[in-house]
Regions:
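C-terminal hydrophobic helical "lid"/dimerization subdomain
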Residues: 2-7, 253-257, 299-334
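Short, well-ordered loop/turn sites that connect or cap secondary structure elements
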Residues: 79-81, 168, 259
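NAD(P)H dinucleotide-binding glycine-rich loop of Rossmann-like/cofactor-binding domains
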Residues: 96-177
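Mid-domain Rossmann-like dinucleotide-binding core that forms the NAD(H)/NADP(H) cofactor-binding site
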Residues: 144-224, 228
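A glycine-rich helix->loop->beta "capping" turn
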Residues: 233-241
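Glycine-rich phosphate-binding loop and adjacent beta-alpha segment
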Residues: 249-311
């Protein structure tokens, strides 16, 4: 067994270093996971470009999977074994605050990306490392997918929480604004819940993929008015659910126009910059529409996400665009 582990450390804007540190000793209640793959999330991209501010030095990575290679003496052997392939949850809820105790870990009052993790040389979530010490509470069995596909577990769990928050019903018309990976995952899950999905994006390569994945309609808002197209498709009723997966406040303000009476607008993305928007309170009163926010995921969502992938209910192969070795980090981030 190697004695040294490797990790990527953000040291400043557009500055990353590959560092070595001793592979941590396994404490009584933890397991040692050798990381097989970690996806680069938009969050880490924003840290890299300086849009998201963190205290340096910082270790990113929260979409990772790997194998258990060593277990502490108190770890339940009925549940875990060396060699198990696992998805790792490191969104780091405290599990003690009111929200966590109420089953809403995704809204933990003390949520902190920058905690110091046991065994790591710097603060951060730590997924962009070769080895991690993890509590079994944050491990989830996964099977029948490649490590690269399995890294989609965490984003899928977040989208699953979003879709369940929207309470989509069979026959609903759902508008998904933004066809990046999060928008495409919203598209897939909405279809699985029996919805007719309209996607909206100025990138027609992305909307083409959304149509291939099962979306019924695609709108390019640079060429067409989204509200008018939604009214045309729905006979004037508009959409029961609108998901905004973009980080742009103006898009969220415009998204309101496509929501039906008694419909739901779900704001999924973080907004950069966080510019206030204008919404008519009288429209909200008369339409009985609901404005909903959703962020992160909880243990239940993570468990469901691993089942969706392991059982082949959701195919995420189209979302694995490039694969890099840890040493190729500069190329990966650029």
């Amino acid at each position: 067994m190697d004695k040294m582990a490797k990790t990527l450390v953000f040291t400043g804007e557009r500055q990353i270093e590959l560092r070595e540190y001793p592979i941590p000793e396994v404490s009584d209640n933890k397991v040692l996971v050798k990381v097989d793959a970690c996806a680069i999330c938009t969050w880490e991209q924003r840290v890299y470009t300086g849009v998201k501010k963190v205290e340096y030095p910082f270790i990113g990575g929260h979409e990772m999977v790997g194998k258990i290679i060593k277990m502490g003496k108190n770890v339940d052997r009925r549940q875990w074994s060396e060699g198990d392939f696992v998805a790792v949850g490191v969104t780091l809820p405290c599990k003690n605050c009111y929200q966590c105790k109420s089953g809403n870990e995704q809204n933990c009052e003390h949520f902190d990306h920058s905690k110091q993790q046991e065994g790591l040389p710097e603060k951060g979530m730590g997924g962009m490392s070769s080895h991690l010490l993890v509590s079994p509470d944050n491990l989830f069995h996964i099977s029948n997918v490649s490590p690269e596909e399995a890294t989609i577990t965490e984003p899928l769990s977040c989208v699953l929480h979003s879709v369940e928050t929207a309470q989509i019903e069979f026959g609903d018309v759902v508008v998904v604004i933004g066809c990046g990976i999060m928008g495409l995952l919203h598209t897939l899950l909405s279809i699985r819940r029996g919805a007719c999905v309209i996607v909206s994006d100025t990138n027609e390569e992305r909307t083409k993929l959304a149509l291939e994945l099962g979306a019924s309609y695609a709108v390019n808002p640079a060429k067409e008015n989204l509200e008018e197209k939604v009214k045309e498709i729905t006979g004037g009723i508009k959409a029961q659910v609108v998901f905004d997966t973009t980080p742009i406040s103006a898009v969220a303000e415009d998204a309101v126009k496509s929501v039906a009476n008694n419909g739901r607008l779900v704001l999924y993305s973080s907004f950069y910059p966080d510019t206030p928007i204008s919404i008519s309170p009288d429209w909200l009163h008369k339409s009985a529409a609901k404005l909903l926010g959703t962020a992160n995921s909880n243990t239940v969502d993570f468990t469901k996400a691993t089942r969706l992938l392991s059982q082949g209910i959701i195919d995420v192969k189209p979302f694995v665009s490039e694969v890099y070795e840890l040493e190729e980090y500069k190329q990966a981030f650029e």
